[in-house]
Regions:
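Hydrophobic structural patches
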Residues: 16, 43-46, 136
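N-terminal helix-turn-helix DNA-binding core of bacterial DNA-binding proteins
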Residues: 21, 25-65
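C-terminal regulatory/oligomerization modules of transcriptional regulators
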Residues: 1-4, 127-147
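Alpha-helical linker/hinge and terminal dimerization helices associated
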Residues: 16-19, 23-27, 62, 105-124, ...
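Charged, amphipathic alpha-helical coiled-coil/dimerization segments
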Residues: 74-134
Length: 147
């Protein structure tokens, strides 16, 4: 790879990492009291999936260790936002589903997050946001293939 290509790659990933850090901070600031960004991410995933997931499946989805996911799931269960039950086919496994209060908490978080995100998109411009989305999606897919 040429020096110019290396410089482009470093600049691009530096911007992506900076945007990620700032986006997380701004989103975390408006989440409902007691909800962390990791909690919202899991609740949002379960709400979209519409089916139960095992802790191992969730850990893989979020590129976390099983221990880290178990910790997050215990916090979500304690808050009443997920139901964790034994897997009827394999007693060694558990299955996780979003609870009605978890769905409500996720909806409240989404309602708080949406204006923050929409404001940034508005300031950048919808056309620019639409133009960069396919590139970011392709980069995500390429990076996911590395795993």
């Amino acid at each position: 790879m040429s020096e110019a290509a290396n410089n482009l790659a470093v600049s691009l990933f530096s911007e992506i990492l900076a945007v990620d850090q700032l986006a997380r901070a701004n989103v975390a600031r408006v989440l409902p009291k007691g909800m962390e960004l990791s909690h919202f991410s899991v609740l949002n995933h379960l709400a979209h999936a519409g089916v139960e997931r095992s802790p191992a499946q969730l850990a893989k989805t979020f590129h976390l260790t099983r221990g880290a996911m178990t910790n997050t799931l215990h916090k979500l269960e304690w808050a009443g936002w997920v139901h964790i039950r034994p897997d009827w086919d394999d007693a060694r496994r558990k299955m996780v589903a979003i609870s009605p209060s978890g769905q409500s908490a996720r909806d409240a978080a989404l309602a708080a997050i949406a204006p923050v995100i929409a404001d940034v998109v508005s300031k950048v411009g919808e056309d620019k946001a639409k133009a960069v989305l396919p590139v970011l999606r392709e980069m995500r897919l390429k990076l996911n293939q590395v795993d």
